[in-house]
């Protein structure tokens, strides 16, 4: 090494100059990286922005709207005609319109919210609540546990329906926006005319909905909370950062990473191979869950999408004319001998051109596809494939798997993708079908079960819809909260009603049960209720009266039925009896007795006022004799003249066993009416926000009275209970006990004034006889369904 400092400096400078002359490798690497293309699924999506003022979505080259609809429970011809009219006269021609039916497994939040009033109490409450939640969560993740030998795909899902539409618009001009806003109003009004209620989907709801469609996690039951970023394009907000999509020949695989755990889902697509021979809108739901054959159901999450384009009327009319003239010409030559069907085809095209020419129909191109999601293993995928193909084939729909085209079909289930040019690709691939507008209206995936109420008794529907029963829910828009239940022994009546009683008690309300057979004794003990035998019941008709003007007629009716269960008292009898009731209460208030009523009647009979009225004196004598059995020294006096009635207002649950009174019908009806009046008075005297419930079990025995007064009494009580948040649940063995000429007036009144009617397993013989007598009461489908109901222990 040189000791000369100048030489060292010179060497360092030369090294720096040499380094500067070398090529810049880092710059070159950055250039190569810039030229590389990393595929991103979000770039395939056209979503960009949302205009809050207009409610429209501004996509890359299109502009559109999205609506969410409440699925309809069923359909009829008028609904189909309204939808057909919308297609023919309201939708712009040549622009795709999509209907999406989504079966979601993200029901965890709904289950927890719905069970909030069915929670356990006590030392082990937390443990039992966790067990209850886990039971339903496991059913949603897989399926409900069933008895050995019963293999039905019963699970929990939530069905949602969406409409999406977009049209080309690069500049997003004010004129385009106004035109689209008017179209939204027209479409929503048309759907409302078809009994389909809709609401607009905003940006937050959009990223939640599309995010669920795209990012399926088979291990998740809870929707992901997405925070809308107003400064980011919507397409990026719909796709998870860990999104990993792999395209296979026969399926797609979707990988995600959530909460430190990896998940992989398999995506399967199936589209319609050809037009079905026949289709009805009201039967479309049977394609994914058959009511009569529940084994033919699709239990995995799926999206059923119908993409349609109404073709230009002039072009299709010209096409029909040319086709008809060609076929009509061939039908008159020897060609028809070789192809006999040509005459039928000519006739069909001739009829079609007439309908097109008069505007009665339009030709619609459509693509029907179902996208299913399952765990990524071959065995599960094979089961899902067979379930889908068999379920649709049962109704005459032949589906095929789009080999090498699953990515294309998957994109069709997403909003606004068809309007970006995807529908054109489908037409070029030859997978688009054509049919008349009326036929396509029958293919719309709009029918699904109703979730009923947000909370209450968890009661899944036949089509696996997560549903709850809360008879007090005001959103049902029922005229009352009453329920009528009919089912044979072992049908599950008690198992249905006991949770409803629990829910009322858990909410702070009270329940009274008329029992015959100890069916509610165990529940009463578990809930800390009061169990009373009919033999030990003690009443006083005047005990709980606070306003005689309000209660006099009800007490009069009670005494009228007690005096004559067969209804032999007329208006004069009742007028005299009303005077006696009022006078007795005014004299002794709550200490009044039936003896005081009889004494008033005796004094009236001996009064000079009726000396010249033998008919009135005769009526007074009749009532004195009839009511004598209920006076303190009468046969049943011990039941109705107590200073301390058996029923106390502080009891939250009371079960009254009336089986011991069945062989004494006069006493039974008197006790029944005394109980109902007690319950009514308690309903009236308690806060209206408090739930009140009266269960009449074995109603066919307790309400079997031919007295029309009983029916009027029941009807009035059942009608007025709603104003005080009260409900009556009447239970019988057979529908004939409620709704037939043989039914008593009381039973018919209970049936007619019950908004909720629950029909369980019926006696096959009795139900067949009922259908012969009343053929219009049930549709054939309903008869078949009821006929297949089994015993509760076998479910």
For each feature predicted by the language model, list its residue ranges.
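Extended, folded cores of ATP/NTP-driven motor/assembly subunits in large transport
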Residues: 1-443
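Glycine-rich phosphate-binding loop of nucleotide-binding enzymes
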Residues: 55-62, 69-72, 83-91, 188, ...
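P-loop NTPase motor domains
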Residues: 82, 86-92, 296, 309, ...
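Short glycine-/polar-rich loops that comprise or flank the Walker A/P-loop
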Residues: 94-96, 508-509, 529, 651, ...
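P-loop NTPase motor core of the ASCE superfamily
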Residues: 147-157, 553-602, 739-795
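Anion (oxyanion) recognition and catalysis
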Residues: 192, 393, 505, 525, ...
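A short beta-strand-to-loop transition that corresponds to the Sensor-1 phosphate-sensing loop
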Residues: 517, 730-735, 761-763
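Sensor-1/coupling segment of RecA-like P-loop NTPase cores
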Residues: 721-738
């Amino acid at each position: 090494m040189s000791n000369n400092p100048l030489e060292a400096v010179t060497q360092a400078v030369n090294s720096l100059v040499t380094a500067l002359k070398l090529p810049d490798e880092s710059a070159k690497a950055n250039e190569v990286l810039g030229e590389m293309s990393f595929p991103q699924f979000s770039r395939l999506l056209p979503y960009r922005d949302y205009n809050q003022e207009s409610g429209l979505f501004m996509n890359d080259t299109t502009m559109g709207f999205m609506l969410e609809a409440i699925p309809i429970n069923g359909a009829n011809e008028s609904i189909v005609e309204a939808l057909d009219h919308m297609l023919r006269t309201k939708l712009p021609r040549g622009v795709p319109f999509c209907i999406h039916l989504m079966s979601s497994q993200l029901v965890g939040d709904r289950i927890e919210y719905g069970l909030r009033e069915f929670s356990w109490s006590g030392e082990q409450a937390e443990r039992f609540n966790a067990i209850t939640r886990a039971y339903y969560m496991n059913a949603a993740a897989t399926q409900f546990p069933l008895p050995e030998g019963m293999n039905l795909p019963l699970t929990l899902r939530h069905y949602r329906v969406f409409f999406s539409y977009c049209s080309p618009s690069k500049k997003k001009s004010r004129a385009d926006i106004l035109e689209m806003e008017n179209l939204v109003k027209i479409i929503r009004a048309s759907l409302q005319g078809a009994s389909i209620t809709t609401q607009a989907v905003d940006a937050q709801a959009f990223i939640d909905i599309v995010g669920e469609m795209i990012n399926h996690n088979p291990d998740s039951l809870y929707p992901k909370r997405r925070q809308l970023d107003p400064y980011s394009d919507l397409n990026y907000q719909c796709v998870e950062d860990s999104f990993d999509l792999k395209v296979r020949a026969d399926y797609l695989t979707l990988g995600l990473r959530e909460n430190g755990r990896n998940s992989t889902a398999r995506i399967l697509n199936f589209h319609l191979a050809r037009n079905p021979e026949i289709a009805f809108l009201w039967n479309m739901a049977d394609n994914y869950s058959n009511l009569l054959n529940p084994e033919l159901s699709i239990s995995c999450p799926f999206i059923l999408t119908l993409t349609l384009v109404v073709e230009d009327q002039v072009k299709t009319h010209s096409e029909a004319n040319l086709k008809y003239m060609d076929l009509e010409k061939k039908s008159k030559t020897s060609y028809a001998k070789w192809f006999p069907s040509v005459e039928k085809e000519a006739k069909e095209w001739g009829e079609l051109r007439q309908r097109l020419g008069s505007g009665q129909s339009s030709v619609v191109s459509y693509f029907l596809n179902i996208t299913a999601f399952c765990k990524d293993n071959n065995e599960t995928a094979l089961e899902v494939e067979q379930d889908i193909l068999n379920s649709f084939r049962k109704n005459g729909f032949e589906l095929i798997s789009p080999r090498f085209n699953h990515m294309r079909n998957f994109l069709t289930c997403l909003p606004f993708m068809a309007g970006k040019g995807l529908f054109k690709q489908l037409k070029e691939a030859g997978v688009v079908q054509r049919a008349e507008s009326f036929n396509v209206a029958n293919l719309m995936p709009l029918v699904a079960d109703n979730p009923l109420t947000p909370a209450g008794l968890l009661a899944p529907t036949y089509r696996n819809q997560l549903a709850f029963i809360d008879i007090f829910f005001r959103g049902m828009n029922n005229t009352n909260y009453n329920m009528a239940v009919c089912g044979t022994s072992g049908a599950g009546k008690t198992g249905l009603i006991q949770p409803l009683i629990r829910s009322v008690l858990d909410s702070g309300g009270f329940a009274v049960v008329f029992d015959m057979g100890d069916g509610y004794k165990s529940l009463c003990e578990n809930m800390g209720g009061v169990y009373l035998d009919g033999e030990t019941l003690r009443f006083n008709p005047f005990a709980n009266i606070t306003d005689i003007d309000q209660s006099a007629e009800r007490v009069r009716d009670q005494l009228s039925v007690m005096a004559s269960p067969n209804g032999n008292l007329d208006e004069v009898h009742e007028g005299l009896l009303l005077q006696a009731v009022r006078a007795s209460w005014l004299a002794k208030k709550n200490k009044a007795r039936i003896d005081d009523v009889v004494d008033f009647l005796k004094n009236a009979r001996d009064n000079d006022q009726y000396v010249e009225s033998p008919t009135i004196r005769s009526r007074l004598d009749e009532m004195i004799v009839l009511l004598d059995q209920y006076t303190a020294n009468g046969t049943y006096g011990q039941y109705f003249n107590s200073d301390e009635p058996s029923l106390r207002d502080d009891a939250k649950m009371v079960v009254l066993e009336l089986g011991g009174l069945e062989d004494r019908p006069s006493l039974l009806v008197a006790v029944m009416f005394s109980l109902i009046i007690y319950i009514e008075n308690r309903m009236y005297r308690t806060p209206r926000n408090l739930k009140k419930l009266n269960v009449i079990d074995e109603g066919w025995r307790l309400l079997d009275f031919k007295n029309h007064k009983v029916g009027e009494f029941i009807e009035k009580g059942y009608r007025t209970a709603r104003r005080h948040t009260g409900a009556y649940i009447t239970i019988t063995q057979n529908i004939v006990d409620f709704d037939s000429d043989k039914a008593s007036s009381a039973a018919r009144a209970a049936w007619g004034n019950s908004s909720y009617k629950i029909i369980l397993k019926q006696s096959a013989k009795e139900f067949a006889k009922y259908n012969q007598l009343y053929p219009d009461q049930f549709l054939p489908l309903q008869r078949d369904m009821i006929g297949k109901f089994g015993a509760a222990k076998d479910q």
